[in-house]
């Protein structure tokens, strides 16, 4: 499993509930194309978290490039209101991404953390969701081509 985080360009507050649900569909379809599984996905107005189960032969960088590229194009097509206001030179995502191997923490803990992200459009108190216990794994910030 890998935990990925993608941030919007300039950390712009872009995603509402509808956009987040569209992204979930796009990400799930891309994962299926790579014979991977989107286990969990959630986020906030300026970033998304994904938990993906992927085959060992798959290069994470290839998956990330496709996830970011496809989601950016499809969201621009399906939500022109977002594209007009927030896309900078046709780009939705910041160039880098966060990727972390999930071998050091139980998948249930990581899944719980992602589920507890405050989805745009939901009214929840973030103080109710402290960082879960057992949150210990190796993290790498990697710059992508997109």
Regions found by a protein language model. Give the residues of each.
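Basic nucleic-acid-binding interfaces
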Residues: 1-146
């Amino acid at each position: 499993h890998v935990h990925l985080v993608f941030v919007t360009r300039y950390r712009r507050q872009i995603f509402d509930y509808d956009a987040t649900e569209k992204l979930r569909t796009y990400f799930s379809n891309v994962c299926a194309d790579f014979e991977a599984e989107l286990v969990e996905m959630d986020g906030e107005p300026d970033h998304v978290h994904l938990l993906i189960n992927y085959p060992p032969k798959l290069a994470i960088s290839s998956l990330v490039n496709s996830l970011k590229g496809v989601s950016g194009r499809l969201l621009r097509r399906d939500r022109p209101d977002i594209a007009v206001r927030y896309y900078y030179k046709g780009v939705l995502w910041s160039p880098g991404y966060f990727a972390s191997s999930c071998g050091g923490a139980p998948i249930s803990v990581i899944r719980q953390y992602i589920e507890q992200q405050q989805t745009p459009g939901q009214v929840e108190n973030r103080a109710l969701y402290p960082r879960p216990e057992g949150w210990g794994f190796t993290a790498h910030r990697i710059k992508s081509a997109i």
